[in-house]
Amino acid sequence: MSSFGKVAVLFGGTSAEREVSLNSGSRVLAALQGQGIDAHAFDPAEQPLDALKGYDRAFIALHGRHGEDGTIQGALEVMHIPYTGSGVLASALAMDKFRTKLMWRAAGLAIPEYALLTADSDFADIEEELGLPLFVKPAREGSSIGVTKVKERGALKAAYEEAARHDPLVIAEKGVMGGEYTVGIIGDEAMPIIKIEPATEWYDYEAKYNRDDTRYLCPCGLPEAKEMEIRKGALEAFRILGGRGWGRVDFLMDEDGKYYFLEVNTAPGMTDHSLVPMAARVNGMDYPTLVRRVLELAAND
């Protein structure tokens, strides 16, 4: 019997990212069980949360709403079960791209210019103000679900309507076209940066999960001093939201080398296409060791 006791691996759930979560969770479960840990699958869509009583720890491999937005974290707090990843407030903030931006801007971090959209927005004015291309996003979804790249004038309203199908809170974000990068965080350490080069026009759901021609560069090609500066900044961005345990910070870089923080993922994917396992591997940590380390960092607020 391991020192972790009885471990629930939470995956599946009811969000739009259920399929990704099932993939992540099944791999996490196998990695834990392969190390002799008493780990069990737990799908909140199929089992009542009361059934978690008697578990000693929880590994959260849920993605999206009710999984990384503070909801399941609050339930685990009430049951006094230590869990992986960030606490209630940090999870809720990070899931909300709009409020993440408010926090980061107040702290002086660089972020892409953006606007909140409603059905009554002057879409032509916003296109003019932000310029094209821009990205329209549901503020509280992940995996690029509901996201549209707007390249032509007059297309913003339709993009808003698509995003609003997923979330009434919608943002339009100025496109930063120099490159997309991500920084995995484990404990107090920022992992090596990964540069993402999708074969598609941008890093959408298809490129993230279903294609094998997306390129992931690690080392990312940035000068060492620049990489260390950004890794330090990513830790700061994570901590400003109250992040703990592990996570992932995404950022964009423009053609002049200026970087802009984009969002935080507090329950990163653990699939065979996922980014934190890639960075950990470059850092000398294989998948089972990574999963065990994340579980070691489980805590309560």
Swiss-Prot record:
Q: Cite the entry's keywords alphabetically.
A: ATP-binding, Cell shape, Cell wall biogenesis/degradation, Cytoplasm, Ligase, Magnesium, Manganese, Metal-binding, Nucleotide-binding, Peptidoglycan synthesis
For the ligand (Mg(2+) 2), the binding residues are 263, 265
Q: Which Pfam families match?
A: Dala_Dala_lig_C (PF07478), Dala_Dala_lig_N (PF01820)
Q: Which cofactor does it need?
A: Mg(2+); Mn(2+)
Q: What domain of life?
A: Bacteria
Just give the chief location class. Answer: cytoplasm
Q: Which PANTHER family match?
A: D-ALANINE--D-ALANINE LIGASE, D-ALANINE--D-ALANINE LIGASE B
| Protein name (database record) | D-alanine--D-alanine ligase
Lineage of the native species? Bacteria, Pseudomonadati, Pseudomonadota, Betaproteobacteria, Rhodocyclales
Q: Which gene encodes it?
A: ddl
